[in-house]
UniProtKB/Swiss-Prot annotation:
Stated family: Belongs to the NifH/BchL/ChlL family.
UniProt binding sites for Mg(2+): S43
Gene Ontology MF terms in the entry: 4 iron, 4 sulfur cluster binding; ATP binding; metal ion binding; oxidoreductase activity, acting on iron-sulfur proteins as donors; oxidoreductase activity, acting on the CH-CH group of donors, iron-sulfur protein as acceptor
Superkingdom field: Bacteria
Reported function: Component of the dark-operative protochlorophyllide reductase (DPOR) that uses Mg-ATP and reduced ferredoxin to reduce ring D of protochlorophyllide (Pchlide) to form chlorophyllide a (Chlide). This reaction is light-independent. The L component serves as a unique electron donor to the NB-component of the complex, and binds Mg-ATP.
Name of the protein this chain belongs to: Light-independent protochlorophyllide reductase iron-sulfur ATP-binding protein
Binding-site list for ATP: G39, I40, G41, K42, S43, T44, K68, N209, R210
Name of the gene encoding the protein in the UniProt record: chlL
UniProtKB keywords: 4Fe-4S, ATP-binding, Chlorophyll biosynthesis, Iron, Iron-sulfur, Magnesium, Metal-binding, Nucleotide-binding, Oxidoreductase, Photosynthesis
Length: 296
């Protein structure tokens, strides 16, 4: 005989996860979670945005939340060990760790952490993200931070990888001007709607990436109540910066395209610091997106 337990929900159709109050990041810190379709450029966007905040004089911490642990390599110029790897080395006795074991200083003083994740097909990567925040709190590493950026795996919005939303003030969604990216963005909007019922996270807006135009994004924004916060065209200097393992702020100063991208990142960072008005966007049904996007 099966017994169904009545449990409070965390938004529609999911189980409420009660976060330990001790893991809350202090109110004065700006916390941003970056989501978007897999391969859309979230890590590039996150790292360059972290660099921009640092250029504005802010103390920045970027947390990579992907088992691939490639979120921060343009900041640190290398692949750094993950929190889960370091914890395994000490048999998960976190008290044996020092901050320098898992926090690495990158470009212009940006602090970088890669949470990592369990082997493919096992465990919960979102749990690892929670343990990473716990470890940072234990070592008082969040107390002297102005901005925290969570760079989150793909467009996965299950309970585990939605964990950064429990800490974030705002969610930025990175998208391209195409159907697949916007379809994924709609699913992320649905997740934000669910989490916003119980947590402080709100939609900040959209970052249009690798797109010459934004006509399809504009259609979706107008219909749902979203807005575009920044627009990065398909600039080859951004691709080359990844190959050089550096941020856009370390590329050739004489390149006008590089200067334009830098200015857009600095503008986005300043806008986020100026207290973005949170959005009350409404997601669409799958069929509605299908009918909305495209050409007549």
């Amino acid at each position: 005989m099966t017994t169904t337990l009545t449990r409070p929900t965390d938004g529609e159709g999911s189980v409420q996860v009660h976060q330990d109050p001790g893991l809350n990041i202090q109110e004065e810190t700006l916390v941003i979670a970056v989501y978007g379709k897999g391969g859309i450029g979230k890590s590039t966007t996150s790292s360059n945005l972290s660099a921009a905040f640092s250029k504005l004089g802010k103390r920045v911490l970027q947390i990579g939340c992907d088992p691939k642990h490639d979120s921060t390599f343009t900041l640190t110029h290398k692949m750094v060990p993950t929190v889960i790897d370091i914890l395994e080395e000490v048999d998960f006795h976190s008290e044996e760790l020092r901050p320098e074991d898992f926090v690495f200083t990158g470009f212009n003083g940006v602090q970088c952490v890669e949470s990592g994740g369990p082997p493919a097909g096992t465990g919960c990567g979102g749990y690892v993200t929670g343990q990473t925040v716990k470890l940072l709190k234990e070592h008082h590493l969040l107390e002297d931070t102005d901005v925290v950026i969570f760079d989150v795996l793909g467009d996965v919005v299950c309970g585990g990888f939605a964990a950064p939303l429990q800490h974030a003030n705002y969610c930025l969604i990175v998208t391209a001007n195409d159907f697949d990216s916007i379809f994924a963005m709609n699913r992320i909007v649905q997740a934000i709607q669910a989490k916003a019922k119980n947590y402080k996270v709100r939609l900040g807006g959209v970052v249009a990436n690798r797109s010459a135009d934004t006509d399809q994004i504009d259609k979706f924004n107008e219909r749902t109540g979203l807005r575009t916060m920044a627009h990065f065209k398909d600039v080859d200097a951004i691709r080359r910066s990844r190959l050089k393992k550096c941020t856009i702020f370390e590329m050739d100063d004489e390149d006008e395209a590089v200067q334009a991208v830098r200015s857009e990142y600095l503008r986005l960072a300043q806008n986020m610091l100026d207290k973005v008005e949170p959005l009350e966007a409404t997601s669409l049904k799958d069929r509605e997106i299908f009918d909305l996007l495209g050409f007549d």
